[in-house]
Regions:
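Sequence-pattern detector for short linear motifs
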Residues: 5, 14, 39-43
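Short, mixed-charge low-complexity intrinsically disordered segments
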Residues: 27-60
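Short, flexible N-terminal segments of the mature chain
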Residues: 14-33
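Short, surface-exposed beta-strand-loop junctions and turns on beta-sheet-rich folds
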Residues: 11, 20-21, 56-57
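Short aromatic-glycine-(Arg/Gly/Cys) micro-motifs in beta-strand/loop hairpins
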Residues: 1-10
Length: 60
């Protein structure tokens, strides 16, 4: 079974169940002190930018 999720502007077909997909997504995130998850970081003009964003899972 493939699980499709949208990550920013990309759709990804994940090889596994919805629960396996969600666990994989959560494992990739960094947890901040207040409990929020950070999914993407990058550097602009010497400063780190953090994008929490949203993840949508379509077939649950």
């Amino acid at each position: 079974m493939k699980t499709v999720y949208e990550y920013y502007t990309h759709r990804v077909a994940f090889e596994g169940t919805v629960d396996e997909c969600w666990k994989w997504i959560m494992d990739q995130a960094f947890t901040m002190d207040d409990g929020r998850k950070i999914f993407r970081t990058w550097e602009e003009n010497g400063e780190m930018v953090y994008d929490v964003g949203n993840v949508y899972i379509f077939n649950k």
